Amino acid sequence: MIQQESRLKVADNTGAKEILCIRVLGGSGRRYAGIGDVIVATVKDAIPGGNVKKGDVVKAVVVRTVKERRRPDGSYIRFDENAAVILKNDGEPRGTRIFGPVGRELREKKFMKIISLAPEVL
């Protein structure tokens, strides 16, 4: 569960290393974001020469959460860290590579490009 002020690792090669959630998109009173939800975030840590710089405001989709998520078959999925992938305005990933596994929930939310770039879908 990601909320305002949550810090997430960036799981792509845009140059950002860490982002801070400033808004969960999807309704005026929405408090939490899970796997597959889009957030507005600011870049807190970035490498020199990357596509994004520290202080940039970006949209990102959550791909891993520490809080477990219940699947329709009764199983649960959880990860060791909170991570997100930075998006362009049209919803496509801004980077060209994805690092680490991503949740299967992204497929239902129509993030097929991220699914195809990810090394593993759990």
From Swiss-Prot:
Gene Ontology molecular function, alphabetical: large ribosomal subunit rRNA binding; structural constituent of ribosome
Gene Ontology cellular-component annotations: cytosolic large ribosomal subunit
Entry annotated with the keyword Ribonucleoprotein: yes
Pfam family, one: Ribosomal_L14
Keywords for the protein's UniProt record, in alphabetical order: Ribonucleoprotein, Ribosomal protein, RNA-binding, rRNA-binding
Swiss-Prot/TrEMBL GO biological process terms: translation
Known function: Binds to 23S rRNA. Forms part of two intersubunit bridges in the 70S ribosome.
Similarity field: Belongs to the universal ribosomal protein uL14 family.
Assembly with partners or alone: Part of the 50S ribosomal subunit. Forms a cluster with proteins L3 and L19. In the 70S ribosome, L14 and L19 interact and together make contacts with the 16S rRNA in bridges B5 and B8.
Name used for this protein in its record: Large ribosomal subunit protein uL14
Taxonomic source organism: Nocardioides sp. (strain ATCC BAA-499 / JS614)
Lineage, broadest ranks: Bacteria, Bacillati, Actinomycetota, Actinomycetes, Propionibacteriales
